[in-house]
Amino acid sequence: MQDKYTPAAVEATAQQHWESTQAFKVAEDAGKPKYYCLSMFPYPSGKLHMGHVRNYTIGDVLARYHRMRGFNVLQPMGWDAFGMPAENAAIQNNVPPAKWTYANIDYMKTQLKRLGFALDWSRELATCKPDYYRWEQWLFTRLYQKGLIYKKLGTVNWDPVDETVLANEQVIDGRGWRSGALIEKREIPMYYMKITAYADELLEALDTLTGWPEQVKLMQKNWIGRSEGVEVHFPYEVSTIGASGVLKVFTTRADTLMGATYVAVAAEHPLALQAAVNDPELAAFIEECRHGGVAEADLATMEKKGMPTGLRVVHPLTGEHLPVWIANYVLMGYGEGAVMAVPAHDERDFAFATKYRLPIRMVVRSTRDAYTDTVAPWQDAYAEQGRLVNSGKYDGLHFHDAIEAIAAELTAKGLGAKRTQYRLRDWGISRQRYWGCPIPMIHCADCGDVPVPDEQLPVVLPEDVAVTGRGSPLAKMPRFYECDCPKCGKPAKRETDTMDTFVESSWYFLRYASADNGQAMVDERVNYWAPVDQYIGGIEHAILHLLYSRFFTRAMRDEGLVNVSEPFTNLLTQGMVVAETYYRDADGGKKQWINPADVEVERDEKGRIVAAKLTADGAPVVIGGIEKMAKSKNNGVDPQALVDQYGADTARLFIIFAAPPDQQLEWSDSGVEGAYRFLRRVWSFGHAFVSEFRPQLPADRQLDAVQLPEALAAVRREIHVCLRQANYDFGKHQFNTVVSAAMKILNALEKAPRDVAAAHAQVAEEGLDILLRLLAPITPHVAHALWQDCGFTGDVLHASWPEPSEDALRQDEIDLVLQVNGKLRGSLRVAAGASNSAIEALALGSETAQKFMEGKPPRKVVVVPGRLVNIVV
């Protein structure tokens, strides 16, 4: 055995052993409970970052721990490989996205292996490979035939220079992020997944997800946004609109209907377009709205603007004729693209009405009695529920009664009805991009839209493509889009849009169960492994990815592909990795961010940074505070450099010890060095055991607790107390305190008296056995090497999780904290099973208590069994 800890050699040996024995390849086993542990798969961006390392370390600790607990553990890995970054890299580096992506996968796979993760690589998948997306296309055709996928016009952000559609986050101040061109809103044909068909089930099933954080469930609940309300029909004023019809609006506040003073429609609404035909000013305003954002977040912050159309509709209850305005805060994609405006009781309508001097009519007296006849500055109380005023026959009715009465009258008149509406919208999956899964549809002039037949799947994405950033490469590639119609055989055109990359990540966890099956999307093995028992990933995926995965699992269930409804039983959202930032002011008001590795810092007595300078020139830099590790702030730590210097086990140990998994992890170089020192101490103790203690073991290796000297019995007890606490903490995912327990065990072993050599060797052997098994999920390489070197049976990978010994925990005597009037005054040694009355007598008779009681009689004595005794005088 080497006397010094050399991480590179230790880790290479362990990893070679695991690979040669296929240690983590797993199959279904009906005789064992299964544990499917999965961390969200990475986008192959080029290199792992610390967020990746933390995510996968947490998952690996859980997977290895459950393996030691006797579970049949699956922990697979794959690559979320489609997406815009590959296209951007292709433009910058003049390399096809496929080549860039596969090179990144190779490099990152090597990194993951060097970190020692217990991954079943036989199930590896990459979403950009035809053997994966073939089945996505196959399911698309099934859902299309069922009506769960359909086609309609959708509003998008169009960059006229790059000739492409941009995501909302790519539009900056109304301009394309790359071209700088003014963005237009365009309506183009798109495919949608009918997630709204599952809205009720997705909402109601949230209550069954007891293993999910409440915050995530609340975010999904709000996103689905079920609301009970009333659909109100405002008949057209024929004299201004020129035809009969109704304008439909949905409201959750039908009680305020009598306060409606105008209606507002989206710029794309048919009434708006009709009004603009002969009105250039209105047409120009609609064009301006087309350049605005299409996200709700944009509407909340942008200036509210509008124009009157000259059209009018009729109030369904009062007969009053209300003006129709075009407003930039109304979206065509939400509800009917129209709202009834009640300025007195809606803050957004209030701001709009105040700006354009529209009538404001109070019709609700709030419970806080904020009612006045004239509306001054907006008060939150105006939006509250209350009793109706200025509402004719409905005056005096409270909120619920008013809604019921008004809904009943609207229904009777045929001008409305009660309705349930959802904030959730169907999922538009068409993307006018190259690097994605081709949509398996063919457009025929005679037959319309025709799904690609099964025998023609997959529709393979050409990989030898030059991406310029202008237009869709597929739309410029006749060899891709020219085809024959599967129905009539005439020349037709293949769909050139690709799918949203969230589609790939919505079912990959089910594909892992049978990733080797080339004949089916999934097979019966999926019903052994699904659902995922523990899913790990960032809370930024709380809504889209996790909601889409829940939807996909149900869609696949209803196709008879899986037997489960929920994809993930337990969800752990790990905290961010953060680090200090430093910068210098540069030209143009910009900041030049400096990596912490290039900075020398000065700290105060509490360890806080008070000054910093650049190592290269010794001149000061500005301390920017703690931020999430990011390229933009240049405060990242390269995991590869960390592993090269300290080893994977040190990186894993620091990540687990620095913070509980769901909390923010603050990077600390000194913390990394501390983790490395601890592992060197573990190694040194293992070496001492092999060279000094093991030869002193008696022939009969059975540890006799009765014969142990008291001091060694105390050491053994401390070890098992730590183990008991570690077992509890592991169950609570408090891995940092598991490491604390391991450190206490090592401290106890190092300080154990050695005067009775054989007994000491026995305690050392048992303690080291426990320590290595405790560390095996966290620092598996060190545990693997020392387990073998120290002569323990078999492979630590196959060892069971240690359990505390009641024999070791048993105490003849225990020490209690002794207090007088609640203040610590000493300790009191009592028999382990002493009664409360016996403890009281011992406490009152002790010299320490007598001294601090100062001759005063005790009022009462409080005994907390096993912990303390408090004398109150």
Curated annotation (Swiss-Prot):
Catalytic activity line of the entry: tRNA(Leu) + L-leucine + ATP = L-leucyl-tRNA(Leu) + AMP + diphosphate
Origin: domain of life: Bacteria
UniProtKB keywords: Aminoacyl-tRNA synthetase, ATP-binding, Cytoplasm, Ligase, Nucleotide-binding, Protein biosynthesis
Single GO molecular function: aminoacyl-tRNA deacylase activity
Motif ('KMSKS' region): 628-632
Motif range ('HIGH' region): 42-52
Family annotation (CDD domains): Anticodon_Ia_Leu_BEm, LeuRS_core
Binding site for ATP: K631
A biological process from GO: leucyl-tRNA aminoacylation
Cellular component GO terms held in the UniProt record: cytosol
UniProt main location, coarse: cytoplasm
Localization (cell): Cytoplasm
EC number: 6.1.1.4
Family under the similarity heading: Belongs to the class-I aminoacyl-tRNA synthetase family.
PANTHER family from the UniProt entry: LEUCINE--TRNA LIGASE, MITOCHONDRIAL, LEUCYL-TRNA SYNTHETASE
Designated name of the protein: Leucine--tRNA ligase
Species of origin: Aromatoleum aromaticum (strain DSM 19018 / LMG 30748 / EbN1)
UniProt lineage: Bacteria, Pseudomonadati, Pseudomonadota, Betaproteobacteria, Rhodocyclales
